[in-house]
């Protein structure tokens, strides 16, 4: 797997341990990973802060990919999707991970640290990063999402 851009990653306190495992896995594959935090456990941190930081970083670095982690994956996904240009997908299995990229052109993968075991999350990350947007009929659909976002 080769990436032309770094992979940005962030979590809240519940995703800190999984984030470390994902970073180690990706670095073993010689991928450039930029950790946007947190770097230490703070049970009072707030997932929107990290989701917004990752989204802003990606907006400044077009065509990049990101990974967000919280307990369910729902909160970081909701927060990230508020940012223009972000197409975040909560994924809990490897098949959906591939389809999120192939059909929906997702650029942020959101993971659950509480309800998906680490080994499955690693498979999800690999599938997501290996998949490519297929375009075709999917371009029209994703285009509608982007057009709606621009109108608002």
From Swiss-Prot:
Top-tier EC class: isomerase
Keyword Translocase: no
Residues that span the membrane, as ranges: none
EC number(s) given by UniProt: 5.3.1.6
Protein name (Swiss-Prot/TrEMBL): Probable ribose-5-phosphate isomerase B
Record keywords: Carbohydrate metabolism, Isomerase
Residues engaged in binding D-ribulose 5-phosphate: 12-13, 71-75, 104, 114, 137, 141
Any one of the GO BP annotations: pentose-phosphate shunt, non-oxidative branch
Assembly description: Homodimer.
Active site positions, chain numbering: 70 (proton acceptor), 103 (proton donor)
Catalytic reactions on record: aldehydo-D-ribose 5-phosphate = D-ribulose 5-phosphate
Naturally occurring in which organism (per UniProt): Mycoplasma pneumoniae (strain ATCC 29342 / M129 / Subtype 1) (Mycoplasmoides pneumoniae)
Primary gene name: rpiB
């Amino acid at each position: 797997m080769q990436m032309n851009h770094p992979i940005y990653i962030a979590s809240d306190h519940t995703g800190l341990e999984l984030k470390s495992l994902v970073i180690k896995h990706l670095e073993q594959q010689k991928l450039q990973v930029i950790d946007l935090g947190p770097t230490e456990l703070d049970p009072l941190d707030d997932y929107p802060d990290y989701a917004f930081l990752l989204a802003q970083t990606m907006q400044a670095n077009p065509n990049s990919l990101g990974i967000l982690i919280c307990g369910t994956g729902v909160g970081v996904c909701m927060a990230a999707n508020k940012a223009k240009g972000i197409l975040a997908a909560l994924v809990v299995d490897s098949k959906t991970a591939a389809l999120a990229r192939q059909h929906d052109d997702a650029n942020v993968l959101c993971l659950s640290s509480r309800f998906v075991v680490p080994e499955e999350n690693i498979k999800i990350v690999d599938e997501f990063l290996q998949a490519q947007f297929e375009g075709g009929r999917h371009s029209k659909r994703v285009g509608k999402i982007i057009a709606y976002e621009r109108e608002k």
